[in-house]
């Protein structure tokens, strides 16, 4: 879990725009980020399996 200080640091506007990075909106995780949902892969999987993300279905082949 990300610390509060790291989440606040990511929210602040940096001196240069290229230094900005994405974090999960739920847990603050910086890796495995899915831009379309603004979630990390772990939170996305949990919320999708609970049916809380509309339009997302489990696929099998």
From Swiss-Prot:
Domain of life: Bacteria
Keyword Acyltransferase among UniProt keywords: no
Gene Ontology cellular-component terms listed: cytoplasm; small ribosomal subunit
Cofactor: record remark: Binds 1 zinc ion per subunit.
UniProt GO BP: translation
Membrane-spanning intervals of the chain: none
Keywords carried by this UniProt record: Metal-binding, Ribonucleoprotein, Ribosomal protein, RNA-binding, rRNA-binding, Zinc
Gene3D superfamilies: 30s Ribosomal Protein S14, Chain N
Residues reported to bind Zn(2+): 24, 27, 40, 43
One Pfam family this sequence matches: Ribosomal_S14
Cofactor: Zn(2+)
Subunit architecture: Part of the 30S ribosomal subunit. Contacts proteins S3 and S10.
Function: Binds 16S rRNA, required for the assembly of 30S particles and may also be responsible for determining the conformation of the 16S rRNA at the A site.
NCBIfam families: PRK08061.1 (NF005974)
Name of this chain's protein: Small ribosomal subunit protein uS14
Gene that encodes it: rpsZ
